[in-house]
Amino acid sequence: MARYTNSLKIFTGNSNPKLASEIAEHLGLKLADSEVGTFSDGEISVRIGESVRGASVFVIQSTCAPVNNNLMELLIMIDAFKRASAAEINAVIPYYGYARQDRKAKARDPITAKLVADLITAAGAHRVVTMDLHAPQIQGYFNIPVDHLLGGPILAKYFMDKELGDDVVVVSPDHGSVTRARYFAEKLNAPLAIIDKRRPKANVAEVMNIIGDVKGKKAILVDDLIDTAGTLVQAAEALLDHGAVEIYACATHGVLSGPAIERLKESPIKEVVITDTIPLPEEKKIDKIKVRSVAPLFAEAILRIHEGMSVSKLFT
C-alpha cells in the first residue's frame, strides 16, 4: 500500500460520503481533506484542504438527488483540482444522473446525458469511472476514457448464495434490459423471460405480455435502476398472474423516488436487492430492501487505474 499513498488521493462531495469512506478504507487510505458547503446565497463552496500538486486524484460523487447540487459540486471540485495542478483527475460517478435523457425521444428534446458529459470534460476531468449506465452508449459521449463497471456480478452473487433452487427464472422487465438479464440468467444457470409492454391504442392501459415460461417458478426481475417502482410492481403482478410463485427484484441503482417505498411495501415482491451507489436514507429502509456494497469493486478499479493495470480483467 505504501508505494502509492503519497500520489493517490480520494476525495468526496456530499452525495455519498459513506461509500467514499469505505472505498478509501479498502485502499488503506483516509479520505483527503476537503470541505464542500454553500455560501449564504446558495452558491456551492469548495475548499481543498491539502496539496494535490502532481497527485492522482479520484473524486467520488454520485449525481443522485439533489441531482443539480451534486453535479455542480462535482464540476467545481474538478475545477479546483485542475487549478491546483493535480496530475490526473478521475471523476468516480457510481450513479450517473441524467442518463435516461440519452436521445431525442420526441421533437425538440435535449440530450442532457451528452451535455453532462461535456460539462465534466470541460471542467477538467481526465477519466470517468461509473457503473451500469442506463444507456451504455453514453460512454461514447465522452472524449476521455470511461471505465464502465458492472453491478451484475454483485447482485447475481447474492442470489447464488441464497440458493433458491432449480425453479428460477430471470425476467427482463422490458426489451432494454435484456442484455443485463441474459448475463444474470447465465450466472444463475436459469432460463430467461421478457416482459413485452404494449399499449393496444391511445388512452388504453398497457398490456404486459410475458415471453417465456414463469409458471411455478421463482422469478427474479433484473433492471439497472428502480425509480418510482411503478413498472416494477406492475411487472411483479403480471408474473403472479402468469403463475410465478415468488417474486424477487434487483437493480444496481436504488433511486427510489416519490411513492417507490410505499409501492414496494405493498407489492408482492419478496425482496428488493440494490447496491449502495446511491445512499439509502433511514426513512427508506424497509425489511424488503437489501443493500450490497460496491466499495470493494470501486476500490479495486481505482487501484488498477492508478497502477496502469487492466480494469476489464475484473469482469473476465
UniProtKB/Swiss-Prot annotation:
Binds 2 Mg(2+) ions per subunit. It is an enzyme of class 2 (transferase). Coiled coil: none annotated. Pathway: Metabolic intermediate biosynthesis; 5-phospho-alpha-D-ribose 1-diphosphate biosynthesis; 5-phospho-alpha-D-ribose 1-diphosphate from D-ribose 5-phosphate (route I): step 1/1. SMART domains: Pribosyltran_N. PROSITE patterns: PRPP_SYNTHASE. This is Ribose-phosphate pyrophosphokinase.
